[in-house]
Amino acid sequence: MNSNFFNKRAIGLVVENGIQKSRRVSGGGYFYVSGNQVNVQRGSCPRNTDYASQTILWGIDNGVTNKSLMRQRHAKQLTYRNIVGKNKNGDIIFIVSNFGGVVTIKDVIEEGVRQGIVEGVLFDGGTSVEYKFKDGWYSTSFTALSDAGKKLSGFGKPTTYIYVN
């Protein structure tokens, strides 16, 4: 899943194979892997992680929704969105838009709460939404903006993806 913008300068911390690729920014939240532990958390990320991607938007913290974020003008726009979170058992949950599934930030956060997310962060939305999920029984993928559309609009391929096996 794409977790940052279409350029080589990611916004926030990115760690790949234990090597920091970009620096932290204040605020937001993290999806990270440390050892065999996968976690989603607002506000902080351990220094020694194997993989990490920071977002500037958090949606749910300890079961409390980010009402301030939901009141922002950009949050009310209907577009493709996603939230990545964990439930009280520590299971990781991805909620993502698909073709025609344009929603507000409030919509995607509230769906996260309905699905049991207690810690959740929102990664880049709109034309940046791109994902592929595959296991032994099921596969689905989605790209908000085709490769041709990216070229025409001057976007490149995203450089930061979340990959979970």
Task: Name each model-derived stretch.
Residues M1-N165:
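Gly/Ser/Thr/Pro-rich low-complexity, intrinsically disordered segments
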